[in-house]
């Protein structure tokens, strides 16, 4: 169960970082960390 949870969180972090890169390249400026 812990192994599955680890993979799920890893996938979530990966997806989040990809989304951040995509949003950052939009040049929108609304999302600024």
From Swiss-Prot:
<keyword id="KW-0602">Photosynthesis</keyword>
<dbReference type="GO" id="GO:0045158">
    <property type="term" value="F:electron transporter, transferring electrons within cytochrome b6/f complex of photosystem II activity"/>
</dbReference>
<keyword id="KW-0812">Transmembrane</keyword>
<comment type="subunit">
    <text>The 4 large subunits of the cytochrome b6-f complex are cytochrome b6, subunit IV (17 kDa polypeptide, PetD), cytochrome f and the Rieske protein, while the 4 small subunits are PetG, PetL, PetM and PetN. The complex functions as a dimer.</text>
</comment>
<keyword id="KW-0249">Electron transport</keyword>
<keyword id="KW-0472">Membrane</keyword>
<dbReference type="GO" id="GO:0017004">
    <property type="term" value="P:cytochrome complex assembly"/>
</dbReference>
<protein>
    <recommendedName>
        <fullName>Cytochrome b6-f complex subunit 8</fullName>
    </recommendedName>
</protein>
<dbReference type="Pfam" id="PF03742">
    <property type="entry name" value="PetN"/>
</dbReference>
<keyword id="KW-1133">Transmembrane helix</keyword>
<feature type="transmembrane region" description="Helical">
    <location>
        <begin position="2"/>
        <end position="22"/>
    </location>
</feature>
<keyword id="KW-0793">Thylakoid</keyword>
<dbReference type="GO" id="GO:0031676">
    <property type="term" value="C:plasma membrane-derived thylakoid membrane"/>
</dbReference>
<keyword id="KW-0813">Transport</keyword>
<comment type="function">
    <text>Component of the cytochrome b6-f complex, which mediates electron transfer between photosystem II (PSII) and photosystem I (PSI), cyclic electron flow around PSI, and state transitions.</text>
</comment>
<dbReference type="GO" id="GO:0015979">
    <property type="term" value="P:photosynthesis"/>
</dbReference>
<dbReference type="InterPro" id="IPR005497">
    <property type="entry name" value="Cytochrome_b6-f_cplx_su8"/>
</dbReference>
<dbReference type="InterPro" id="IPR036143">
    <property type="entry name" value="Cytochr_b6-f_cplx_su8_sf"/>
</dbReference>
<comment type="similarity">
    <text>Belongs to the PetN family.</text>
</comment>
<dbReference type="GO" id="GO:0009512">
    <property type="term" value="C:cytochrome b6f complex"/>
</dbReference>
